[in-house]
Design a protein with these regions (language model features):
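Surface-exposed interaction regions that form or flank ligand-binding interfaces
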Residues: 2-99, 139-141, 148-155, 162-201
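Structural signal for conserved beta-strand scaffold positions within catalytic alpha/beta enzyme cores
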Residues: 102, 127, 159-161
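Active-site metal-binding core of divalent-cation-utilizing nuclease and nuclease-like domains
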Residues: 97-115
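Active-site beta-strand-loop-beta-strand hairpin of nuclease catalytic cores
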Residues: 115-126
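Short beta-strand-loop-alpha-helix junction that forms the active-site gateway
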Residues: 129-134
Length: 201
């Protein structure tokens, strides 16, 4: 039972699904530790064999610091952001006729903007972030601009920091989708979801 539990914990979580950010942080922490241990092992081996730091393995160890440092930057960048709360996931799951994406960390040249959830349905995009540091106008404009560049047309793109307001908007989207009984723009919604994933760390 314990073995199966550990295997379940290490099971790959796809980008855009609940739990991805926490999973990705664990993977990158493990990868970073392994990289630095390998660098240390290579350097130590070279020093033990030659009794000097001026050897080929030292050069290899120095070069190995580059991917190790890159992995460390990934850990540091993602570390402040946690996966979406399961309570929100449970509430949004009540809108099964919509397209959903979770655990986003959207980036521009100047900003890093965490977004817990985005719901897409029939020409409308609603998103939620609990970070008060995120400028909602900047975030909405960035997503609209990216959609325009990718020839995706939406009448409404809006993000919220108010949990209850966001849920009420999602409830409204679900009601409309249920009445229509089908996704009018299913392919475009899938493309929009993929765009958001591409824009996210």
């Amino acid at each position: 039972l314990e073995k199966s539990r550990r295997e379940e914990q290490m099971k790959r979580i796809e980008k855009g699904t609940p739990g991805y950010l926490d999973y990705k942080k664990k993977v990158e922490i493990i990868r970073t530790v392994i990289y630095f241990l390998l660098v240390a092992a290579i350097f130590t081996l070279g020093y033990v064999q030659t009794k000097t730091r001026s050897n080929l393995l030292t050069v290899v160890a120095i070069l190995g610091c580059l991917p190790a440092a890159k992995a460390l930057v990934g850990v540091i960048t993602r570390f402040p952001y946690a996966s979406v709360d399961q309570k929100l996931v449970h509430e949004v799951t009540k809108a099964p006729h919509t397209t959903r994406v979770y655990d986003l960390v959207l980036t521009t040249r100047e900003k890093i903007m965490p977004v817990e959830c985005v719901v897409i349905s029939n020409g409308t995009v609603f998103g939620y972030t609990d970070s008060k540091k995120v400028d909602l106008n900047v975030l909405s404009k960035h997503i609209r601009d990216m959609m325009t560049q990718n020839r995706l047309s939406y009448s409404t793109v809006k993000f919220y920091q108010d949990y209850k307001v966001f849920l009420s908007r999602i409830e409204g989207l679900e009601s409309i989708a249920m009445v229509e009984n089908a996704k009018i723009n299913g392919e475009e919604e899938a493309q929009t979801r993929q765009l958001l994933l591409n824009l996210s760390m």
